[in-house]
């Protein structure tokens, strides 16, 4: 029978503690029987070390009775020596050989808790919700402390649907964002991201800016409200709003584009993902006269949007070509993924509106960004932070990895 023991080291972190512990373990093995390292976890939190090591030994046939007791006694002497030499505390306890096999059944998931700041009740609520559906938190690590604080909990023994349902109420009552992602290679294998433009990549709605310059803001607002109430579909409402722009000088498009304000964190998100090898693009129900120059400015790989018809230097109030609506956005995602040879499960889509839902559902990860409740409820996960680069934490990237990927002189 294999004898196993857990050594727990705590104290002020300093160079050489881990090396001294494992060197001492090697000597124990030499004195008795070979010692094997079964498991190791180490974390340093604000200079305080917590190191856990599970070691085991398998006595040879014909070994003397009491071998396990001698093994534990040797580890006890080791703990005292390492503790004195390193200024740390080392505890030793026997553990069950089947301890690792006793973990809850089910696939593991990452639960990401984000906030500005993260209140204790958010972590408490998440932990209670996880335990309430039979899950277990195996590990916690901080992903970022800026621009949002975020923590990643590795959870076993709970299914994604149950986790999302249990955590949704916690997010609603605490104001924190809580995302769920399955542990595995697919999380870090994402290779393409598609972003909505209005109220996602940029602040505000381009068509509202154009309508204001045309003196038709109130009319366009009424059409938008009718669409939101289900009285018009997106294509009908788009045509009606574009018709209200008839006669507007084409130069106004340049003026509006020059005054666009990127959502905070947009440049950081795109630059980081580009340096990590992502294909990045935009899919918009807006207009190519705005989105194409924006895509070029940001170094994006692709863009899809509607095209305003122009005649004699003025908008005609019509559109050219196929309309990019809810279905059109989803088709664009599929087209871009196929062009770059990337499976849909390795794609990410980010948007805020109902016309983004098909795209969010098709992507491997669909993120509702500052969206209305019915959009948040149907997306894989939701972010209500003002910073677009919080998407990086949902993907599992730490603040340190982001800083390594983006030059410090870059603007957000």
Features from the language model and the residues they span:
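C-terminal cap/substrate-recognition subdomain and adjoining C-terminal extension
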Residues: 247-365, 369-412
